[in-house]
Amino acid sequence: MALLQLERIGAQYPGAAAPVLADINLSLGPQQLLVALGPSGSGKTSLLNLIAGFIKPGSGRITLDGIPVEGPSAERGVVFQDDALLPWQNVLANVAFGLELAGVGRLERETRAREMLALVDLAGFDQRRIWQLSGGQRQRVGLARALAADPRILLMDEPFGALDAFTREQMQELLLQVWQRTAKPVFLITHDIEEAVFLATDLVLLAPNPGRIAEHLHLDFGRRYAAGESARAIKSDPRFIETREHVLASVFSQRTREQCV
C-alpha cells in the first residue's frame, strides 16, 4: 500500500511561460527507494520540493497516508546536497537540533542523536566540530539529522553530488544499509546514471519542458546489495550494464529531442 501518493501533479512558477511539471502520477510505499533522474529542465528538484511541502502544486494533489501535504513537516525528512549544518555547534548538537526545536528533552534527544550517529558509522564523533569533518562525514551528519526526527519518508536532493567518486560510492552503500535497517521509504533525485540504477527499486526517468514521466523502471540492484551481494559484483553484472546503457540512451534521447525543438 502506498504511503505517499502524487495524483496528476502539475506545477508552474509565477511569471513562467510554461509549467515545470505536468501530469505526474507517482506512489511511494514501504521498502521502496524511488529515484528520479532526468536532464536539466525535467523538474527533479521541483518534484522533491512539492513532496517536501516547500511549494504547492498548481494542479493535482499530494497525500501522505491519505492526508493532503500542505507544507513542510517532520514526517518528511530532507537531506540536501548542501548539508546546511550549523558550524558553531558540534556534531551531536547538529543531529539533535530538530528534536530540540520540537521540545524534546535533552537526555532523550542526545540519546536519539547518538543512535543515529552510530547508524551512519559516526559513533564517537559527537563532540567534533563541523569544520573538522570531511565532505562525506558532513553528509553522514546531515543524514543522521534527518533520521533523528523519525520521519515517515526520507527525501534526498542530489545528496552526493558534491562528493568525490570514492566517497560517493561509500555514501551510496551506506544509504542502502540505512534504508535496509530503518525500512523507511526514500525519494532521491540525482543526475548520476550509475548511482540511479544502483540505488533504485523504482527509477523514474523524467523528460523536460514540462517535466513529465517518460519511463518507470523496476530494479533490484539496490536490494541485492542490501542482501549482501558486493557492489563490484552487481556493477559488473551484464544486466546492470545493459540497464545503465538503456537509461543513458533514454536520457540522451530526451536531451537531444529538447535541443531540436
Swiss-Prot record:
It is a peripheral membrane protein. Its EC number is 7.6.2.7. It comes from the Bacteria. Residues 4-233 form the ABC transporter domain. One of its GO terms (cellular component) is plasma membrane. Disulfide bonds: none annotated. It is found in: Cell inner membrane. GO terms for molecular function: ABC-type taurine transporter transporter activity; ATP binding; ATP hydrolysis activity. InterPro entries: AAA+_ATPase (IPR003593), ABC_transporter-like_ATP-bd (IPR003439), ABC_transporter-like_CS (IPR017871), ABC_transporter_ATP-bind (IPR050166), P-loop_NTPase (IPR027417). Belongs to the ABC transporter superfamily. Taurine importer (TC 3.A.1.17.1) family. The complex is composed of two ATP-binding proteins (TauB), two transmembrane proteins (TauC) and a solute-binding protein (TauA). Part of the ABC transporter complex TauABC involved in taurine import. Responsible for energy coupling to the transport system. NCBIfam families: PRK11248.1. This is Taurine import ATP-binding protein TauB. The lineage of its organism: Bacteria, Pseudomonadati, Pseudomonadota, Gammaproteobacteria, Pseudomonadales.
